[in-house]
């Protein structure tokens, strides 16, 4: 396929001089709307919408209140309760902003309201206390992804206040369990399809833009493909016994040996049309740097595992050349004075598109040997999904909006997401999805999603509201005060045979 090659833009050379710190530049969002958006963002962050805490409905109500106050009728606001993990009752929110004269199929906006657990003892500050400090907003969900929830909501509310009327319905879907089971997205793409059916979807889960630590723009990646999420449980068994009489074999030691094998193992490197186009762009950006040389070597020979390993050693490129698996949790033993009878490790894999999870299971089992049991998580069996096809209108809208806010050096390119999102469930059901949120950070120091002291630059949040306004105007046409922005058309390199 050549779906990505026609939209690839020339990157700014990596040898360019360091630019102004983007965190210090003024936002394009008016002060009154900054205050409104900040207050909603603060309230959202301070709701601990972690699984089993029952707080997702509070986030749904907060967002729904904004739409309702802007004029969306109650009949177009749907609270959808469901069970995610066993015993974990959560909720999704579906809101339809109707066009008075729809001429095209609806556009779907995706996000999720749940967040990953955060321990107060691990963080410098309370993760569920909204904090603004040194040009950043801190708190769990500031970058994954209550920022996107609030930005898309407030962009729509602001447009409604300005009298904008779209020429297609815009549907907002915010799930309640993206970080665990993805049950909400499964239901929304199937059972609730009458409420969510759309021509295409735009996912606000994850920012497309980033800068390096010298403040040079690294570009804006439109994710059109995702790796498949799959968790496996590795278990060892042993007769056990009294701890005063150690055996030569031990369930914990055996499991540790297996995990060391996983740590050192590298799956076969792979490329597809999206990742190849991405790395061609990165090679141009890197020039003749060591990383640029390794990328060109791997593009010339996709089986060059040494070059792929060197690429993956760069923190910006981890997970982009192959399937990756990593141990994430451990449990074992039953008493401090007894030899362990079993030990279990949770190993999470992000599988390259097109590779079946069953094939990865076979490969892992062969790696660790017959004495370690390898089984997939029965609560979630990953399903590989196809890449979304190129949509020039989406690319043009993203390019115009991101370059209006961050300058022409923020080039747009295709990419594959190493993470998993609700978009995969819609892709599997025939609705193409594009991950395009306009927020940004300094890479890698701001890449703290799921980690400690999660944060987002203040300007990145405010400008994201403006970004989504421009996206809605570009892709939903309509009536009302028009944007003064002239569209920026991407330049395309020659088509390859």
Predicted regions span which residues?
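Bacterial N-terminal signal peptides
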Residues: 4-15
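Acidic/His- and Gly-rich active-site-bordering loop/insert found
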Residues: 20-140, 159-168, 347
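Acidic/histidine-rich catalytic neighborhood of metal-dependent amide-processing enzymes
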Residues: 136-137, 143-221
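Solvent-exposed loop/turn segments at secondary-structure junctions
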Residues: 50-52, 83-86, 100-102, 113-117, ...
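Short pre-catalytic strand/loop immediately N-terminal to key active-site residues, enriched for Gly-Thr
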Residues: 133-144, 412-413, 453
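Metal-dependent amide/peptide-bond hydrolase catalytic core
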Residues: 19-21, 207-218, 222-469, 473-497
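Stable alpha-helical elements in mature extracytoplasmic
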Residues: 33-41, 55-59, 63, 148, ...
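Loop/turn elements at helix/coil->beta-strand transitions in domains of secreted/extracellular proteins
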Residues: 73-75, 103-106, 167-170, 196-199, ...
């Amino acid at each position: 396929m050549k779906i990505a090659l026609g939209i690839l833009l020339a990157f700014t050379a990596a040898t360019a001089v360091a630019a102004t710190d983007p965190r210090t530049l003024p936002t394009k969002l008016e002060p009154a709307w900054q205050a409104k958006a900040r207050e909603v963002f603060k309230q959202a962050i301070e709701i601990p919408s972690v699984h089993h805490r029952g707080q997702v409905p509070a986030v749904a109500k907060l967002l729904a209140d904004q739409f309702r106050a802007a004029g969306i009728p109650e009949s177009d606001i749907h609270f959808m309760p469901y069970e995610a993990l066993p015993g974990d009752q959560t909720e999704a929110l579906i809101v339809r902003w109707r066009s008075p004269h729809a001429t095209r199929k609806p556009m779907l906006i995706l996000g999720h309201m749940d967040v990953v657990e955060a321990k107060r003892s691990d963080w410098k500050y309370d993760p569920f206390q909204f904090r603004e400090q040194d040009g950043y907003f801190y708190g769990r969900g500031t970058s994954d992804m209550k920022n996107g929830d609030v930005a898309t909501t407030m962009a729509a509310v602001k447009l409604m206040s300005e009298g904008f009327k779209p020429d297609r319905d815009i549907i907002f879907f915010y799930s309640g369990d993206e970080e665990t089971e993805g049950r909400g997205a499964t239901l929304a793409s199937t059972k609730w399809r009458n409420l969510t059916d759309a021509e295409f979807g735009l996912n606000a889960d994850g920012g497309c833009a980033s800068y390096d630590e010298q403040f040079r723009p690294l570009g804006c990646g439109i994710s059109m493909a995702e790796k498949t999420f799959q968790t496996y449980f590795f278990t060892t068994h042993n007769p056990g016994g009294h701890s005063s009489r150690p055996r030569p074999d031990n369930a914990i030691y055996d499991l540790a040996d297996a995990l060391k094998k996983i740590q050192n193992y590298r799956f076969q490197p792979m490329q597809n049309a999206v990742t190849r186009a991405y790395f061609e762009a990165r090679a141009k950006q890197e020039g003749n740097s060591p990383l640029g040389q390794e990328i060109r070597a791997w593009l010339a020979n996709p089986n060059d595992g040494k070059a792929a390993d060197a690429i993956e050693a760069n923190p910006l490129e981890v997970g982009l050349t192959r399937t990756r698996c990593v141990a994430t949790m451990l449990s074992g033993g039953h008493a401090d004075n007894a030899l362990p009878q079993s030990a279990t490790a949770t190993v999470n894999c992000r599988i390259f598109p097109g590779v079946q999870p069953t094939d990865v299971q076979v490969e892992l089992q062969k790696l660790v040997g017959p004495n370690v049991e390898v089984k997939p998580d029965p609560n979630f069996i990953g399903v590989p999904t196809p890449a979304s096809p190129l949509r020039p209108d989406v690319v043009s809208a993203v390019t115009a909006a991101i370059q209006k806010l961050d300058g022409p050096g923020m080039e747009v390119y295709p990419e594959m997401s190493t993470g998993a999102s609700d978009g995969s469930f819609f892709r599997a059901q025939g609705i193409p999805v594009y991950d395009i949120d306009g927020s940004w950070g300094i890479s890698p120091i701001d890449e703290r999603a799921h980690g400690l002291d999660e944060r987002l630059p203040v300007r990145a949040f405010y400008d994201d509201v403006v970004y989504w306004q421009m996206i809605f105007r570009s892709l939903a046409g309509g009536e009302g005060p028009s944007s003064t922005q002239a569209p920026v058309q991407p330049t395309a390199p020659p088509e390859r045979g």
